[in-house]
């Protein structure tokens, strides 16, 4: 009996020291930084905050002065293909509509990325963001 208690105590001690891995939730949820190359209206660098409310992907690009609101977004789990449309304004107040298409890379990693292309009525280019 005493051996059993000692073995049980050692097992509990080992289990307490083991790392705990939690489920992360939606693969797009979180803060992202990256670039949309060649964007002369809003600059090459971008910061995004994305969320999943249980029904839809929501978010903002460059929150603050350059708020670009994501109007619609879809994520196809087959191939992890992302499509979103966003609306911002240039310095004169004219509406700029963005369409971004990309694919999630390194899905299993915390610092996964989305790589693809962006386009608007003012240009097009490469798009890449990495989750922070």
Indicate residue ranges for each PLM-predicted region.
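Bacterial N-terminal signal peptides
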Residues: 7-16
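Central antiparallel beta-sheet cores of small beta-barrel/beta-sandwich binding domains
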Residues: 22-132
């Amino acid at each position: 009996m005493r051996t059993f208690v000692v073995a049980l105590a050692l097992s509990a001690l080992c289990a307490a020291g083991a790392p705990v891995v939690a489920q992360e939730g939606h693969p797009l949820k979180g803060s992202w930084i990256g670039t949309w190359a060649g964007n002369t209206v809003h600059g090459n660098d971008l910061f995004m905050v994305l969320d999943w409310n249980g029904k839809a992907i929501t978010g903002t690009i460059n929150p603050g002065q350059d708020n670009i609101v994501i109007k619609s977004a879809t994520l196809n789990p087959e191939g992890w293909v992302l499509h979103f449309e966003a609306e911002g304004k240039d310095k004169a107040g004219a509406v700029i509509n963005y369409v971004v298409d990309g694919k999630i890379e390194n899905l299993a990693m915390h610092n996964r990325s989305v790589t693809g292309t962006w386009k608007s009525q003012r240009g097009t280019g490469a798009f890449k963001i990495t989750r922070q």
